[in-house]
């Protein structure tokens, strides 16, 4: 019984040690503001193409196709 208790204690200590090293680091997120792409024309149906166009042509951080009434539009995300 003592051997079983020491194995359980060792496993618990290993779990605590592992959890201490795996703690996520918090980074202050930068707020992004969205606005419709100025270079995209037509309905947006390709997220990857929209993202590439926003990043490469408009110097945005990100881009995606979002539904904005009445159709999907390419929306670019810039730091506020």
Swiss-Prot record:
Query: Where does the record locate the signal sequence feature?
Result: 1-29
Q: Which GO terms describe its cellular component?
A: extracellular region
Q: Which domain of life is it from?
A: Eukaryota
Q: Which residues carry this modification: Pyrrolidone carboxylic acid?
A: 30
PROSITE patterns, per database record: GAMMA_THIONIN
Q: Which Gene3D superfamilies match?
A: Knottin, scorpion toxin-like
Which compartment or compartments is the protein found in?
A: Secreted
Against InterPro entries, the record matches this protein to: Defensin_plant (IPR008176), Scorpion_toxin-like (IPR003614), Scorpion_toxin-like_sf (IPR036574)
Cysteine pairs forming cystine bridges in this chain are 33-80, 44-65, 50-74, 54-76
The family database entries (Pfam families) matched by this protein are listed as: Gamma-thionin
Q: Which keywords does this chain's UniProt record carry?
A: Antimicrobial, Disulfide bond, Fungicide, Plant defense, Pyrrolidone carboxylic acid, Secreted, Signal
Per the record, the GO terms for biological process are: defense response to fungus; killing of cells of another organism
**Does the record's keyword annotation contain Secreted?**
yes
UniProt subunit comment: Forms oligomers in its native state.
Q: What does this protein do?
A: Possesses antifungal activity sensitive to inorganic cations.
Sequence similarity: Belongs to the DEFL family.
Question: What is the protein name stated in its UniProt record?
Answer: Defensin-like protein 1
């Amino acid at each position: 019984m003592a051997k079983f208790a020491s194995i359980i204690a060792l496993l618990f200590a290993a779990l605590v040690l592992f959890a201490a090293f795996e703690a996520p680091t918090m980074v202050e997120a930068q707020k992004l503001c969205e606005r419709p792409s100025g270079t995209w024309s037509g309905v947006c149906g390709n997220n990857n193409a929209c993202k590439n166009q926003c990043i490469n042509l408009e110097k945005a951080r990100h881009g995606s196709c979002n539904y904005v009434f009445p159709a999907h539009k390419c929306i670019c995300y810039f730091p506020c």
